Every structure is written in C-alpha cells, then in structure tokens.
Amino acid sequence: GSIACGEPITAEQNIEKMVDVPENIRCDFSLTCHGDSMVDAGIHDKDVVYIRIQPEVENGEIAAVRIDGEATLKRVYYNPGTLTLMPANPAYAPMIYTGPQLEEVHIEGKAVGWTHWVG
C-alpha cells in the first residue's frame, strides 16, 4: 500500500508489491511513502516504511495514522484534549485535532523502520 508524507491520501488496503524486510525489523506490513513531509526524520519520497500494528504510540513516535478514511505518516504528540500530527519538514504545518475531531483520528501502527528507494 501507500501512505502520504504530505497531505493525507485515501487509505486503501492493497498489495502493490512484495518487499524483502530486513531481518532486524519486526513489522506487520509496509507502505510506500509519497511526499516529503518526513524528510527531516530521514523518510523520503518512495521510501518503504515498515509498520507494526498497534492502536497507540508513545509521544513523539512516528505512526501511520488514518484520519476520516485518509492516511498519513507523522510524529504523534498527545496533550490534554489535543492530538498533534507533526511533519518532519518545516514546509508543512502541524495537523491539530481537538474535541469531536479526535474521533476521526486512528493510529494504525508504529513505524519501526524504513528503507530508502534507490532509482
């Protein structure tokens, strides 16, 4: 599948290709990144990010997040009554959710590693 590293894209479960996962990474699925919002974390356009399914992540961890049917990859920060999805590129604004908006945000899993696309 694919995940946005920029503006969220429609979340679809599909197999695009099979990838070899490095032996030291324990994951449930992988996604191809599209965009440049996570470049300062070392995740670039077309990189493959490995996701371990879990409904929560620690403050500041990178996660695959579904927002009202769309998916994005961001650092997650929790504050009382607020969830912030923070890009790792100053060209992008944080995505801040409060109150009823929080019901639309679902952590799909934690990014446990990634490999760079060479092409």
Cite the ranges covered by each PLM segment.
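Short acidic low-complexity segments
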Residues: 51-58
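Well-ordered beta-strand positions enriched in small/hydrophobic/aromatic, beta-favoring residues
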Residues: 31, 63-65, 85
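Hydrophobic beta-strand signal
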Residues: 48-51, 64
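PDZ-domain C-terminal substructure recognizer with occasional recognition of PDZ-binding tails
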Residues: 72-96
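Short, flexible active-site-adjacent loop segments at beta-strand->alpha-helix junctions, enriched
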Residues: 3, 55, 89
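Short, positionally conserved secondary-structure boundary motifs
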Residues: 1-44, 59, 70-71, 78-82, ...
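Short aromatic-glycine motifs in intrinsically disordered, low-complexity regions
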Residues: 65-66, 93-102
